[in-house]
Amino acid sequence: MAKSKTPAKRARRAEANRLRNKAYKSKLKTAIKNYENAIIAEDLDTASNKLLQVTSLLDRSITKGILHKNNVARKKSALSKKLNSISQ
C-alpha cells in the first residue's frame, strides 16, 4: 500500500473508478444480451428498440471514458448487422 497521502488517494480513486466502470460494463453486457435474445426470437420491433438502448449506452460509454470510440463503433456495426440479417 502507498505510504504518502497522494498515492494513497490515487489508489482509492482508481478503485472507485474501477468499480464504477465494472458496473457500467455489466449493465451494457446485460443490454446486449437482451438485444441478442430478441434477435434469436426474431422479434423485429423489440430488437430495434433494444438496439436503440444499446446504442445509447455504448455512446455514453465513450463520453464516460469506459470504452474507446473504435471499440464502440465495431460493436455498433456488428449489432446492426444482426438486426439487418433478420429484417430481410
UniProtKB/Swiss-Prot annotation:
One of the record's GO cellular component terms:
small ribosomal subunit
- BP GO terms, sorted: translation
Q: Sorted alphabetically, which keywords does the UniProt record give? A: Ribonucleoprotein, Ribosomal protein, RNA-binding, rRNA-binding
Q: Tell me where the transmembrane regions lie.
A: none
Q: Per UniProt, what is one GO molecular function of this protein?
A: small ribosomal subunit rRNA binding
The source's superkingdom equals Bacteria
Query: Which InterPro entries does the UniProt record give?
Result: Ribosomal_bS20, Ribosomal_bS20_sf
Which family is this sequence assigned to? Answer: Belongs to the bacterial ribosomal protein bS20 family.
Known PANTHER family for this protein? 30S RIBOSOMAL PROTEIN S20, SMALL RIBOSOMAL SUBUNIT PROTEIN BS20C
HAMAP family per record? Ribosomal_bS20
Per its database record, what is this protein's job? Answer: Binds directly to 16S ribosomal RNA.
Q: What protein name does the entry list?
A: Small ribosomal subunit protein bS20
Q: Which source organism? A: Syntrophomonas wolfei subsp. wolfei (strain DSM 2245B / Goettingen)
**Species lineage, top-down?**
Bacteria, Bacillati, Bacillota, Clostridia, Eubacteriales
Q: What would be the name of the gene that encodes this protein?
A: rpsT
